[in-house]
Amino acid sequence: MTNTTTALISSWCYFCFCALASLAVHATASEAPQVRVFNTSFIGHRDSTGVESFRGIPFAQAPMGERRWRRPVPWQGDGGPYDATAFAPACMQTGSGLAWYHGMMRRVGVDPALMEGPVYSEDCLYLNIWTDLDAEGKRPVLIFIHGGSNTGGWSYEPNYHGESLVKRDVVVVTVAYRLGVFGWLSHPEMEARNLALYDLAMSLEWVYQHIGKFGGDPNRITVSGESSGATNALHLAVSPLSQGRVGGLIHQSGGWPLDDTPDRSEATARGIELARRALDGQTGLEALRQVPSERIMALAGEVYADFQLDPIEDPESLPVTLESMAASGSIAAIPMLIGTNADERLMYLKAGGTLDQLLQRRVAIAQQDDVRAYLSGAGDELAQRNQLGTALDFLCPSLELASLIEKNDGAAWVYRFDRVRPGFDAIGAYHGAELPYVFDRHDDWLPSSKVDDDLTAVILDYWTSFITKGRPRSDQGGPWPTWSSTQQTAVFNDGVSFKAHPDRELCRLLMDR
């Protein structure tokens, strides 16, 4: 057994010891809710509807100073009460997540100053829980992993709060993980790679050991994520670090690592270059740990400008990459709900780009004429670029994932989200558009209608039944067939319809299906 494996097992054993020593304390209606975990009493908040929230619960010690670029270490309380009524700082980032929200607000004529961003810190490994402590029995658990290209976002963005899911008998947990080079650096002197994946694994283990005190069932954990959060959820599910704790997976608008896993040697070369620039030609990791985080982020923006920070092959955390699994046709048959939005790429297309450029850069020469002919029915060139970009980065690898699950005797359900909000024609069913429906958290500034309210109810039916029963069902929406050779897909728009995936032929052309 390696020293690194021994250290990891020791961390899990600490969690087990904590679980045996845990004690839950339910408050009366007039008191703040309290839950005791090991030697710490977490004091939460109860809202007017009876939903309790526990915010900013630490699951690991601050990965700062000498702990920067090391595996996470379990948090240990000091035996006193812990105020869990406020969210903790978000992980270090440049603010791209907040900029996304501000851009959306400008589109609908709302002053972005109305939304303030979080505080950022390297001390950021916290989780948040929404629950009903007075509900009977143990309820299934949803762990949600936020997106943001692995460089931005935070666990308590407005769309991720869990009150509505709690009302449907789900305990909701949202988790943080180190972002950018703080979570994804590869350097020859590091003891481990994919540190953000270790963060997520530690948060999963914390939930497994302690969620029972918050009313959750540790044996019914579904992990969900959107965009890079979806790919991280999938990586966590297939990683040995998860120890089989993931019972189901919801994969929203991810998929690209099935086609393109970052090269480990290239990732390491970038890490060395980051150190060289930060240390005036030196490359030592210990010295790099002393460089201020703001300086690290500024340099990382240059060094990694054209490099996607995603999990890389690693003997302990990811011995087999998703790309290798796709190539071999073998993957763990975890039940999965998988989908994409119709216009994932539209709002990100750069002015001046052309379809020819995209075809030449991303599509094999032998396929270009057939793909061009297919796209001719999509509308103008902007629509064609969106359709192709969405298919390449999100749709086709997601369908490939569903087919892998089906091939390995698992169950997968596939959706496409097509709903365009009033006044949003310019960006369509954009990347992230489904999230307010999934959590029933429509921002006040988002234009909505009764159609959106009705669609939210149907989507909540399907998502919560998948979490609670392992299969998406809705009396309002009708039966949702599993993915098979007929490629039946739930299409969410004004309502829900079921048909063979509208763009299956495009994926066949691109992926030689």
Describe each model-derived feature in a short phrase:
Residues 11-23:
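Bacterial N-terminal signal peptides
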Residues 147, 196-199, 227-230:
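Active-site loop->helix "elbow" adjoining a glycine-rich segment at hydrolase catalytic centers
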